[in-house]
């Protein structure tokens, strides 16, 4: 886990920890969006291991189009880091232009890997059954980590 300078201290008892490993991105994001709108604080770990279904080249081209769509100074801005991609996907499922949506978005944390505070508190992360990859009928998918590298992000520690 990479600790970023902007990482604020977290009280583990206030946060529900969800593991994104082998979870379909859109399904997981919709569950998380509903729960943070209800007032729950959620930390999603291992976001680089979440998957997007479809063929790798198609997914890469779609994301490159999104990134290159706007003006570099004015936006829209699309992230390349897996944790920020996850947050952006959840943001798209919230009423972002309302106070309620922005307040809900503040209750979401996304991490690459497992943060130190989760390991120290010995928290068992929750898995979202509706989002599990085992429900897929095909093997066409790409992980968020792979997509990020294709978009130009360099994963720390060579993950």
Curated annotation (Swiss-Prot):
Any Gene Ontology CC annotation: cytosolic large ribosomal subunit
Domain of life: Archaea
UniProt GO BP: negative regulation of translation; translation
Entry-linked CDD domains: Ribosomal_L13 (cd00392)
Signal peptide span: none
GO molecular function: mRNA binding; structural constituent of ribosome
Keyword Electron transport: no
SUPFAM superfamilies registered for this protein in UniProt: Ribosomal protein L13
Keywords from the UniProt entry: Ribonucleoprotein, Ribosomal protein
Record's subunit section: Part of the 50S ribosomal subunit.
Function: This protein is one of the early assembly proteins of the 50S ribosomal subunit, although it is not seen to bind rRNA by itself. It is important during the early stages of 50S assembly.
Protein family per UniProt: Belongs to the universal ribosomal protein uL13 family.
Name by which UniProt lists this protein: Large ribosomal subunit protein uL13
Lineage of source species: Archaea, Methanobacteriati, Methanobacteriota, Methanomada group, Methanopyri
């Amino acid at each position: 886990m990479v600790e970023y300078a902007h990482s604020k201290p977290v009280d583990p008892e206030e946060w529900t920890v969800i593991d994104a490993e082998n979870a379909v991105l859109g399904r997981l994001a919709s569950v998380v969006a509903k729960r943070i709108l209800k007032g729950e604080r959620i930390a999603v770990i291992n976001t680089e291991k979440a998957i997007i279904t479809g063929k790798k080249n198609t997914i890469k081209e779609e994301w490159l189009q999104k990134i290159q769509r706007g003006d570099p100074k004015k936006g829209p801005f699309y992230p390349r880091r897996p944790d920020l991609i996850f947050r952006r996907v959840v943001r798209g499922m919230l009423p972002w232009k309302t106070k309620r949506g922005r307040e809900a978005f503040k209750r979401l944390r996304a991490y690459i890997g497992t943060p130190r505070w989760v390991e120290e508190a010995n928290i068992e992360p929750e898995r979202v059954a509706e989002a599990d990859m085992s429900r897929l009928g095909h093997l066409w998918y790409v992980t968020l980590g792979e997509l990020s590298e294709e978009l130009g992000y360099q994963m720390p520690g060579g993950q």
